[in-house]
């Protein structure tokens, strides 16, 4: 029997896809992003749900989805790591015509084509566009995420881009032009979000006995992040 590791489930989510959403956080992630605010989700913990149990819990919220064009978003951690479990849950949800979004960095264990056959929207997290910087930031190489993007490009699934802006690393024109070049390789982009780096995860690191890599780095100013986004849109519109 397939079982999955679900860290938490949030209802009434408003930022992880269209409408009101149930957000399911699946445990496990290969990346060790220096700015990660959910280090408690890195490891696969107890297998606490069958596909049927999780689907039943999500389907309970279907009346809310219908009123607001919402649905479910699988996040993490990295939901692609639990590919077999994710596929089985999605099969059950599709029978109920529930909109399914996938919040991912694109670093899983394969089965991407089958997973994406059930997905209505991909929220794609861009860690860094430079392979060396990506490795430094995540402790993982960039190749696996590119494999996922290659499969994603063969689909017609709409994509929302999410880019965390870390002060001193992404808040410059050199990075913005590199990001433009990277996004030109990704099809069906419908939205781009710049997310200001925050320090809300620091306490979690203390509780887990892990040193926080960016302990001396201040949060990204929200107004500066918005101006950077506006600058990026201008760069995108240039020839």
Can you describe what each PLM-predicted range is?
Residues 2, 8-10, 14-49:
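Canonical Radical SAM [4Fe-4S] cluster-binding loop centered on the CxxxCxxC motif
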Residues 39-44, 135-141, 209-217:
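Short glycine-enriched, charge-decorated loop/helix-capping segments at active-site entrances
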Residues 39-68, 72:
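Conserved alpha-helical substructure of the radical SAM core
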Residues 23, 27-30, 48, 52, ...:
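Electropositive phosphate-/nucleotide-binding environments in soluble metabolic enzymes
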Residues 59-63, 68-71, 76, 80-200, ...:
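Conserved AdoMet/S-adenosylmethionine-binding subsite of the radical SAM
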Residues 1-18, 167-239:
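Auxiliary Fe-S-binding modules of radical SAM enzymes
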């Amino acid at each position: 029997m397939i079982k999955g590791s679900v860290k938490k489930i949030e209802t009434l989510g408003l930022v992880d896809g269209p409408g009101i959403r149930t957000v399911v956080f699946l445990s496990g992630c290969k990346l060790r992003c220096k700015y990660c605010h959910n280090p408690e989700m890195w490891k696969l913990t107890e297998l606490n749900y069958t596909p049927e149990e999780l689907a039943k819990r999500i389907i309970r919220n279907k009346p809310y989805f219908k009123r607001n064009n919402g649905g479910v978003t699988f996040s993490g951690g990295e939901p692609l790591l639990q590919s077999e479990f994710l596929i089985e849950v999605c099969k059950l949800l599709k029978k109920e015509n529930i909109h399914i979004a996938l919040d991912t960095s694109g670093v899983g264990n394969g089965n991407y084509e089958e997973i994406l056959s059930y997905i209505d929207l991909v929220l794609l997290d861009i860690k860094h566009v430079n392979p060396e910087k990506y490795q430094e930031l995540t402790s993982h190489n960039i190749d696996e995420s590119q494999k996922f993007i290659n499969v994603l490009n063969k689909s017609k699934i709409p994509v929302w881009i999410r880019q965390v802006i870390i002060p001193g690393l992404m808040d410059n024109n050199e990075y913005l032009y590199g990001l433009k070049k990277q996004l030109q390789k990704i099809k069906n982009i419908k939205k781009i979000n710049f997310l200001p780096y925050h320090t809300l995860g620091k306490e979690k690191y203390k509780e887990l006995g892990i040193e926080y890599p960016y302990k001396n780095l201040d949060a990204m100013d929200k107004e500066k992040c918005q101006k950077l986004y506006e600058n990026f849109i201008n760069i995108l519109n240039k020839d």
